[in-house]
């Protein structure tokens, strides 16, 4: 099992390869989420971060989805709804030669980068807040679909989580 430091070293290499690919194909991206916070606050990664978060404009995201299989390394897999190999509303770039373990998930996992398309938002602040609240609920439900039953930091959390997992799988 890789240490968090080893995972971050591999992620850095993965990011450099992704950066080269994007420059060669005129795709503009930026770090987001915890990756952006880590780059600014820690001059690298947040100490516990085990993935990279990237965002692209919708046109660059669609370009990436279209050209990726033709020009990127074979030891990578791009998962997305558009490629019919993911249930998430964003892409995930997996490095197939580095498997990672997640004690809370049943999903097979490889080292990965999450790649999010960025679309415009309404001008009304209340609508924006509503969109983000819904997104958070949907994201949690998708995450629970792969979670392990009976696993949690305490018995009560594991019990509640098990009920939520069953609900999330029923809803879809």
Segments the model singles out, each with a brief description of its role:
Residues 1-23, 68-123, 139-172:
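Conserved catalytic core of two-metal-ion nucleotidyltransferases
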Residues 19-52, 61:
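Active-site nucleotide-donor binding segment shared across nucleotidyl transfer reactions
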Residues 132-137:
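Membrane-anchoring alpha-helices and their flanking helix-loop junctions
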Residues 55-57:
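Short hydrophobic/aromatic beta-strand micro-patches
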Residues 124-130:
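A short secondary-structure junction signal
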């Amino acid at each position: 099992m890789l240490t968090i430091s080893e995972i971050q070293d591999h992620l850095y290499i993965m990011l450099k390869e992704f950066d080269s690919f994007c420059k060669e194909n005129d795709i503009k991206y930026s770090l987001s989420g915890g990756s952006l916070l880590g780059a600014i606050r820690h001059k690298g990664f947040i100490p516990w971060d085990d993935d990279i978060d990237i965002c692209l404009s919708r046109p660059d995201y669609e370009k990436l989805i279209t050209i990726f299989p033709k020009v990127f390394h074979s030891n990578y897999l791009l998962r997305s709804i558009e490629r019919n190999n993911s249930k998430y509303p964003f892409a995930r770039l997996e490095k197939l030669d580095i498997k990672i373990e997640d004690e809370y998930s049943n999903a097979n996992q490889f080292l990965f980068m999450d790649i999010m398309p960025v679309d415009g938002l309404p001008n009304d602040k209340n609508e924006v807040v509503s969109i983000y609240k819904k997104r958070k609920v949907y994201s949690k439900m998708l995450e629970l679909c792969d979670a392990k039953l009976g696993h949690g930091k305490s018995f009560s959390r594991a019990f509640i989580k098990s009920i939520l997992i069953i609900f999330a799988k029923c809803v879809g």
